C-alpha cells in the first residue's frame, strides 16, 4: 500500500482481534460440537487444543506481522519467491470465505428485521427455504431469492463504508463499539435463559461428561478443528492485523486475552442456547435430543420456533440474538477481507480506498451468485471444500515454512521483549513438529470425507474453485513481481 496504517491504541487492536476471531461459528457450531463430542469431557481436548495449536500459532502470526509489517504475499515472496504462490492461494481461499460469509449474514439480517413481528410465521423452515436460504432442491437453481439479493447489496455497501477508511478509523472504531455490545447482549440472553423453566435440562444435556469419548481420536480431531476455525489461525487475518501494530505492544499477553475472550464468548453462547433448548423441550414435551442441531437449522429454524413459543419475551430475545450474530459476523468479515486487500494493494501499489472499492464490488458480485434457490446448499458445499481441502493444508505449509526459513529464535526474542508472558524452546518444537503433523492428519481425513461424499455437482464446484484459485494465484505471482516494484 502507499501508506502503512497503525492501530492508535492497544485497546483498539485488542477489540479488532477479538472481532476477527469471534464469528458465526462460535454461535451456531460450538455448542453442537461440544455436545456431540463428549459433553463436559470435551473441555479436556478443547483446552489441550488451545494450548497446543491455538495459542502457539497465534503467537507466531502476531510475531511475524509485528516484525515484518508487510502483506502476506510479500512476506512469503521475501522468504522465497517460490512460496509466493502459496500466499496467494491462502488469501484467495480466505476471500472466498468472505464472499459466502456475507451471504450468511444476509440471512441473519433478514431474520433480524423479521424478529420484531415473527415474520417467519408458524413454519420457520418453510420461510427459510422460500424467502431466505433456499434448499438443496435443484429446481430452484435458476431462481433468485430477492430478499437475500437485496440484503447482500446492503451489507456490502455498509462493509465498504467501514473498510474504506483507515484501519483504525474504520475497523478499529467499529470493533470498539460492536465487541462490548456483543458481550453485553449475549450476557443478557444468558442471564435470561437461566430463568426459563427447563434450563437445567439443557445445561445437564450439554455438560454431562462422557469420559469414554476421550478414547475416540475423532473427538480430539474435532477439538483441534474447532480451535483452528474458531480462532481463525493460519488464515493471514491475524498476521495482517498484526502488521498494523505499534512498537510497544505486549504481543503474547494480547494473544492470551484474545483466546480467553473467544472461549468465554462461545461457552456463554453454548450455555444460553442449550438453556433455551431445555425450555422448549419442557414446554413442548419434545425430547431435547430432537431439538439439537447446528448451523442454519439451529439458528434459522429451531430457535425461531422457540421464540414463537416464548411469546412477547421472544420478541425481545430474538432481535438481540440475531443482532449479536450480525455484529460477530460483520467484524469477522472485515478481517476475512483484509489479507487479500493488503496483498493486492501491496502488489499493485494501490491506495486502500481503491483496493477496498475494487475488491468489494467483486465480492458483492460473488455473494450475489449465492442468492439463488439453492443458496444454503451451495454455501455448505463451498464452505466444506474451502476449509477442509484448501485452507487446512495451507496452514500446515505455513508452519513448515516459517519454522524452517524464518529465524524463530530471533522472533521469540521479539515476542518476549514487551510481554509479561514468555515463550521458550517448546514453542518452536510445537510449531515445527506437532502442529504440521496434526494438521496433515486432519487434512487427509477431511479430503477422505470429501471424496466419500462427492457427487457430480459437488465435484464441479470443487474443480471450479480449484482452477479459479490456482489460476489467479499463478497470475498474481507472475504479474508485476513484488521485488521489481518500488
Residue ranges and their predicted role:
Residues 12-49, 201, 237-242, 253-256, ...:
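Transmembrane helix-boundary motif of multi-pass solute transporters/channels
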Residues 12-18, 88-91, 119-164, 232-238, ...:
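Transmembrane alpha-helical segments of multi-pass small-molecule transport proteins
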Residues 5, 34-60, 86, 147, ...:
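Extracellular loop-to-transmembrane helix junctions
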Residues 2-5, 33-37, 70-89, 102-168, ...:
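Inter-helical loop and helix-membrane interface segments of multi-pass membrane transporters/permeases
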Residues 1-28, 57-62, 66-78, 85, ...:
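Membrane-interface "cap" regions at the ends of multi-pass membrane proteins
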Residues 57, 98-124, 183-207, 279, ...:
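Hydrophobic alpha-helical segments and their helix-loop junctions in multi-pass secondary transporters
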Residues 348-360, 386-461:
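C-terminal membrane-solvent junction of multi-pass transporters and transport-like membrane proteins
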Residues 2-11, 172, 176-330, 334, ...:
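Membrane-embedded translocation segments of transport machinery
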Amino acid at each position: 500500500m502507499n501508506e502503512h496504517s497503525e492501530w492508535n491504541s492497544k485497546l483498539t487492536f485488542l477489540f479488532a482481534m477479538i472481532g476477527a476471531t469471534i464469528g458465526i461459528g462460535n454461535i451456531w457450531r460450538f455448542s453442537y460440537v461440544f455436545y456431540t463430542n463428549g459433553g463436559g469431557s470435551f473441555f479436556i481436548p478443547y483446552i489441550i487444543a488451545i494450548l497446543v495449536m491455538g495459542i502457539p500459532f497465534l503467537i507466531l502470526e502476531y510475531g511475524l506481522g509485528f516484525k515484518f509489517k508487510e502483506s502476506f504475499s510479500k512476506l512469503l515472496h521475501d522468504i522465497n519467491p517460490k512460496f509466493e504462490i502459496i500466499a496467494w492461494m491462502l488469501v484467495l481461499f480466505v476471500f472466498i470465505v468472505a464472499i459466502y460469509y456475507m451471504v450468511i449474514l444476509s440471512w441473519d439480517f433478514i431474520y433480524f428485521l423479521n424478529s420484531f413481528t415473527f415474520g417467519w410465521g408458524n413454519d420457520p423452515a418453510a420461510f427459510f427455504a422460500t424467502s431466505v436460504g433456499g434448499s438443496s432442491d435443484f429446481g430452484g437453481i435458476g431462481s433468485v431469492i430477492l430478499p437475500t439479493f437485496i440484503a447482500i447489496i446492503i451489507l456490502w455497501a455498509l462493509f465498504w463504508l467501514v473498510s474504506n477508511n483507515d484501519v483504525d478509523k474504520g475497523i478499529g472504531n467499529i470493533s470498539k463499539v460492536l465487541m462490548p455490545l456483543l458481550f453485553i447482549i449475549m450476557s443478557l440472553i444468558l442471564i435470561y435463559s437461566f430463568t426459563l423453566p427447563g434450563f437445567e435440562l439443557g445445561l445437564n444435556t450439554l455438560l454431562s461428561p462422557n469420559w469414554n469419548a476421550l478414547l475416540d481420536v475423532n473427538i480430539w480431531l474435532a477439538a483441534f478443528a474447532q480451535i483452528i476455525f474458531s480462532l481463525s489461525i493460519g488464515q493471514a487475518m491475524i498476521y495482517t492485523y498484526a502488521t498494523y501494530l505499534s512498537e510497544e505492544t505486549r504481543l503474547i499477553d494480547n494473544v492470551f486475552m484474545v483466546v480467553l475472550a473467544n472461549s468465554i464468548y462461545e461457552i456463554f453462547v453454548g450455555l444460553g442456547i442449550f438453556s433455551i433448548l431445555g425450555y422448549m423441550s419442557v414446554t413442548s414435551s419434545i425430547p431435547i435430543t430432537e431439538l439439537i442441531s447446528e448451523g442454519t437449522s439451529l439458528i434459522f429454524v429451531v430457535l425461531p420456533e422457540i421464540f414463537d413459543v416464548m411469546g412477547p419475551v421472544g420478541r425481545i430475545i430474538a432481535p438481540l440474538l440475531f443482532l449479536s450474530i450480525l455484529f460477530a459476523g460483520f467484524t469477522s468479515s472485515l478481517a476475512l477481507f483484509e489479507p487479500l486487500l493488503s496483498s493486492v494493494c501491496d502488489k499493485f501499489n494501490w491506495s486502500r480506498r481503491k483496493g477496498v472499492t475494487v475488491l468489494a464490488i467483486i465480492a458483492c458480485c460473488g455473494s450475489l451468485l449465492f442468492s439463488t434457490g439453492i443458496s444454503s446448499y451451495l454455501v455448505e458445499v463451498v464452505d466444506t471444500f474451502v476449509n477442509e481441502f484448501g485452507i487446512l493444508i495451507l496452514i500446515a505449509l505455513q508452519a513448515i515454512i516459517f519454522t524452517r526459513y524464518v529465524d524463530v529464535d530471533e522472533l521469540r526474542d521479539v515476542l518476549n521483549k514487551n510481554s509479561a508472558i514468555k515463550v521458550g524452546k517448546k514453542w518452536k518444537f510445537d510449531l515445527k513438529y506437532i502442529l504440521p503433523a496434526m494438521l496433515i492428519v486432519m487434512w487427509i481425513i477431511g479430503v477422505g470425507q470429501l471424496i466419500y461424499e462427492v457427487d457430480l455437482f459437488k465435484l464441479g464446484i470443487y474443480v471450479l474453485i480449484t482452477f479459479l484459485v490456482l489460476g489467479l494465484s499463478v497470475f498474481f505471482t507472475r504479474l508485476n513481481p513484488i521485488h521489481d516494484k518500488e
